[in-house]
């Protein structure tokens, strides 16, 4: 199943516990679910540290995991104790957020600052149980982007080289060489579809 739902973006989620211990973990069940306002979701198998911290203080950040940070991301996936600081374990520096308390990964070229909106218990979660699958939805209240990746007002995502999760232990990476542009077709007055022609005209459809 997971090998077919691919590639999947990686949500590198940072939270803070009640005793101010930092937590950092990657989640490949992650994606945007709405824009204007912006919402993201990630799904946790069992009530893990990230979920507990988010439900306690209502905030998290999501840093973009890239080719350059792949080793740190992998270290932060280790199933360590609840009070372990994965930033320290992975030798990753933090950078302060503007609108939430949890920091972002300093080396990440982009990050989202989020407020917890809702946790949805999927059907395999028994009442009061910490076992099963939990979907966490957050509203994005702030966005950080490294200026060097903004060109003519457009984010050059491919230059960031974000990682993607495949199946099994496989990963992918987005690069300028593996991306391409396709214009969407238009519908003519007679109802027929007209194929897009030429270069992208700069209009989002």
Map each language-model feature to its residues.
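Basic, polyanion-binding surface patches
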Residues: 1-205
């Amino acid at each position: 199943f997971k090998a077919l739902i691919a590639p999947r973006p990686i949500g590198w989620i940072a939270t803070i516990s009640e005793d101010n211990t930092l937590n950092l973990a990657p989640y490949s069940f992650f994606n945007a679910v709405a824009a204007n306002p912006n919402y993201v979701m990630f799904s946790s198998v069992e009530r893990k540290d990230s979920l507990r911290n988010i439900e306690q203080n209502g905030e998290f950040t999501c840093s973009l995991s890239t080719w350059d940070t792949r080793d740190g991301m992998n270290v932060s996936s280790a199933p360590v104790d609840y009070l372990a600081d994965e930033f320290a374990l992975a030798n990753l520096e933090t950078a302060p957020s503007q609108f939430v308390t949890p920091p972002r990964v300093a080396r990440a070229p982009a990050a989202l600052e989020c407020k917890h909106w809702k946790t949805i218990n999927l059907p395999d979660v028994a009442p009061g149980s910490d076992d099963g699958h939990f979907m966490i939805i957050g509203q994005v209240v702030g966005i950080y982007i490294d200026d060097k990746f903004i060109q003519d007002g457009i984010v050059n995502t491919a230059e960031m080289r974000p990682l993607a999760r495949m199946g099994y232990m496989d990963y992918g990476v987005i690069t300028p060489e593996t991306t391409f542009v396709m214009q969407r077709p238009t519908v003519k007055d007679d109802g027929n579809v007209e194929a897009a022609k030429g270069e992208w005209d700069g209009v989002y459809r």
